[in-house]
Amino acid sequence: MKLTMDKIDGMLIACLQGVVNSANAEQLEAELAAQVDKGERRVVLDLGRLDYISSAGLRVVLLVAKQLRQVQGELVLCELKPHVREVFEISGFLSIFPVANSREAAAAAFKTALPR
């Protein structure tokens, strides 16, 4: 798994590449949780380069979303490949999280206004 993060227009874009599984889920959780602890409130998970996500990876998504909700933050998923989207659909996650086709659409999916 490779994780790159960029701050764009008040959003943290976390781009996952490769495979998220039990071998690296803990690292991913720590890195994303640290960003929320530092004050990030709008997080976009760009999954366009993600090849596979296991149940351990899905757990991380849930935990980060919960952490964000506790601080009035939001999580939006974007650019899911068909086979990754299927995993999220089967798990019921598509009914829990906003999903966008692009980063631009993800920005529009946030419910709260950006702080001024």
UniProtKB/Swiss-Prot annotation:
Phosphoprotein recorded as keyword: yes
Pfam family membership, one: STAS
PTM remark: Phosphorylated by BtrW. Dephosphorylated by BtrU.
Keywords assigned: Phosphoprotein
Cysteine-cysteine disulfides: none
Domain of life: Bacteria
Domain (STAS): residue spans on this chain: 1-110
Phosphoserine: residues bearing it: 55
A single GO molecular function term of this UniProt record: anti-sigma factor antagonist activity
Quaternary organization: Interacts with BtrW.
Note: Type III secreted proteins Bsp22 and BopD accumulate intracellularly instead of being secreted in cells expressing the mutagenized BtrV.
Function: Possible positive regulator of sigma-B activity. Non-phosphorylated BtrV binds to BtrW, preventing its association with an unknown partner(s) that might be sigma-B. When phosphorylated, releases BtrW, which is then free to complex with and inactivate its partner. Involved in type III secretion system (T3SS).
Family: Belongs to the anti-sigma-factor antagonist family.
Name used for this protein in its record: Putative anti-sigma factor antagonist BtrV
Native source organism of the sequence: Bordetella bronchiseptica (strain ATCC BAA-588 / NCTC 13252 / RB50) (Alcaligenes bronchisepticus)
